[in-house]
């Protein structure tokens, strides 16, 4: 899903894009925004002259030009998301619908314990307690093997808590 089409209708929005997730370039800390000429002009007034280093710029441009990588990444993310949703539905675990590379799952009062068990099993996920959502965990969509491992260890942790 994209909000880019809203730019033609509204002149007071900025659509931001990151290279962190789908392009797997989180370490270079680069992104861009799409907006009306008026908004871009205002940003130019406060923008630092050298806010993104040369290497990061080159990596970002190369990423945009590599359509095959983007297509494959989207396919892997979509199939991984579909798999996780099917498994979570089977387990009776609710989740928030998303168009990102992660899924937010709701585990209720057992969230912290499941989180601790999964961490001890080598599954790295994010607790959303610091964001005011103590009964939710954020799970990044991984490879097929990683997703299978997550579900296997999630099932194991839920059994331990029964």
Spans of features found by a protein language model:
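Short acidic/glycine-enriched loop/turn segments that link adjacent beta-strands
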Residues: 27, 99-100, 132-135
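PLP-dependent aminotransferase class I/II
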Residues: 12-89, 93-96
